[in-house]
Amino acid sequence: MANKKIRVTGAEAEQPSILKRISGALTLNPLDYHLDYSKLISLNFMVKISFHDASDYDLFVREGITPVELFEALASNWSTDSGEVHYVDGNTHDKDEIDTSVKLCELITIIKDLPFHKSEESTHFSILSTSLTLGFGDQILQKHDNSVIPIITERSLPQYMHAIIQYEYPRVSGGIAATICAGICIRSPPIGNCPPIMKPLHLELLCYHYGLKMSGDAPSPAEGKIGRIKRPTERKEDTPSMTKRLKGGVGATISRMLSWKE
């Protein structure tokens, strides 16, 4: 994760509008702020936000949403220590330098209400249909809302896998998909005052359970549309990783895998 922050500073003497001040961030070059991931993710712009629990997050918003839609929604919840809205300009300042603070639960609500457009089949890393990716830092030590379950992957997920993930993890539907990391992880509840535990969940397990391939091939015509993908009832002979169908479905098995009881 890049350590460089996008900073916010005080308003100019002319007192430009909130939207103009905030939308100035759109002129930033993503390569300046997220060198590792900007080449992997197709982004229109990036905004870095420091939340109320002092953890740093990168908020990635991909193709489909207009600057006006995003920043008008954020404007009413945009807060600073000084009580006035400041704008993001990407520069380093010696005076009046603060980080923008938005509560995580409020931001989730705002993003869910925005009219996102579906990305094209060729664009990847849009795990949920909202095309929203929230990147968590290397360490998450503060308590968070139990309803927030990040899914993390470094693979280019085929479009049809989005519906499968949402089907298996309904708590993620309309929630947040986290950014690039090794494998898929889901934060294990309950969180409470304890640090969340990230345990690996392999894409291969989901793909096997649905008879799909990791190569990105779409389901065969016999498997029907995305919403009606059927689970295999028998183990494929060329898949030695499992010996029988999982009782209760892959969702129940994964829930047991992610249990806090070892």
UniProtKB/Swiss-Prot annotation:
Homomultimer. Interacts with nucleoprotein and with the cytoplasmic domain of glycoprotein. Residues 219-243 are annotated as: Disordered. Its main location: virion. One of its GO terms (molecular function) is structural constituent of virion. Keywords: Apoptosis, Host membrane, Membrane, Viral envelope protein, Viral matrix protein, Virion. Plays a major role in assembly and budding of virion. Completely covers the ribonucleoprotein coil and keep it in condensed bullet-shaped form. Inhibits viral transcription and stimulates replication. Transmembrane segments: none annotated. It comes from the Viruses. Belongs to the nucleorhabdovirus type-1 matrix protein family. Disulfide bonds: none annotated. This is Matrix protein. One of its GO terms (cellular component) is virion membrane. Most abundant protein in the virion. It is a peripheral membrane protein. The gene is M. It is found in: Virion membrane; Host endomembrane system.
